[in-house]
C-alpha cells in the first residue's frame, strides 16, 4: 500500500506538472527492496506529445520511483545499505547527494505514457570507502516499465550516495 504522506513529501521537489508517480508498493525479498509503481504522464513537461514514453520521462520516472523506494526503505528498515539512515537523513541528502552514476534504458515496444506501470529493485547495495576518499554507498539497480498494450522498456542504473551519514 502506498504511504501517501511519504509519497507527497518525496515528490515535493518536483514541479506540479512533473509529478508522474501515482502509487508505489515496496516489498523486500532476501534482503533486497523493490517497488512496484503506477505512473501517469498527462502531458510531457518539455516536448510536444510523442505518443510514447521517451528517454527523458523514463529517467524522471526512475528518479521518482527510486526516491520513494529509498525513503520507504529508510522509514521501514528494509533492505541493506541504509540501516543507519533516518528519514531526516534522506530528506537532507535526497537532491544533492544521490547521484545516478550510470543509466541505460532499452525500448522494446512503445509504452503509452498516459497510464503505465513500473518496477525497480536494488540488486546490490554496498558501502565503499576508497583509499584516501570519503565513504559512499554504491547501488546497482534494475527497472522496467510496461503498459496494457504490451509496451515495454527496461534498463539498469548505478547509484552513488555521497556524503553519507
UniProtKB/Swiss-Prot annotation:
Broadest EC class assigned to this enzyme: lyase
Catalysed conversion reaction: a (3R)-3-[(carboxymethyl)amino]fatty acid + holo-[ACP] + H(+) = a (2E)-enoyl-[ACP] + glycine + H2O; (3R)-3-[(carboxymethyl)amino]butanoate + holo-[ACP] + H(+) = (2E)-butenoyl-[ACP] + glycine + H2O
Record flagged with keyword Lipid metabolism: yes
Coiled-coil ranges (or none): none
Keyword Protease: no
Pfam families membership: FcoT
Gene3D superfamilies cross-referenced by the UniProt entry: Rv0098, thioesterase-like hot dog domain (3.10.129.30)
Organism: Streptomyces coeruleorubidus
Gene responsible for this protein: scoD
Protein name per Swiss-Prot or TrEMBL: (2E)-enoyl-[ACP] glycyltransferase
InterPro entries found in the cross-reference section: FcoT_ThioEstase, FcoT_ThioEstase_Rv0098-like_sf
Amino acid at each position: 500500500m502506498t504511504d501517501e504522506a511519504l509519497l507527497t513529501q518525496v515528490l515535493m521537489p518536483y514541479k506540479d506538472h512533473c509529478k508522474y508517480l501515482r502509487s508505489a508498493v515496496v516489498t523486500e525479498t532476501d534482503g533486497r527492496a523493490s517497488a512496484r509503481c503506477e505512473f501517469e504522464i498527462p502531458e510531457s513537461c518539455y516536448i510536444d506529445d510523442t505518443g510514447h514514453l521517451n528517454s527523458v520521462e523514463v529517467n524522471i520516472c526512475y528518479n521518482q520511483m527510486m526516491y520513494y523506494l529509498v525513503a520507504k526503505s529508510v522509514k521501514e528498515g528494509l533492505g541493506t545499505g541504509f540501516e543507519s539512515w533516518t528519514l531526516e537523513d534522506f530528506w537532507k541528502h535526497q537532491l544533492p547527494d544521490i547521484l545516478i552514476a550510470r543509466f541505460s534504458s532499452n525500448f522494446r515496444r512503445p509504452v503509452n505514457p498516459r497510464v503505465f506501470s513500473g518496477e525497480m529493485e536494488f540488486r546490490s547495495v554496498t558501502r565503499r570507502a576508497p583509499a584516501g576518499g570519503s565513504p559512499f554507498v554504491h547501488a546497482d539497480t534494475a527497472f522496467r516499465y510496461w503498459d496494457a498494450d504490451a509496451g515495454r522498456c527496461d534498463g539498469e542504473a548505478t547509484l552513488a550516495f555521497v556524503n553519507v551519514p
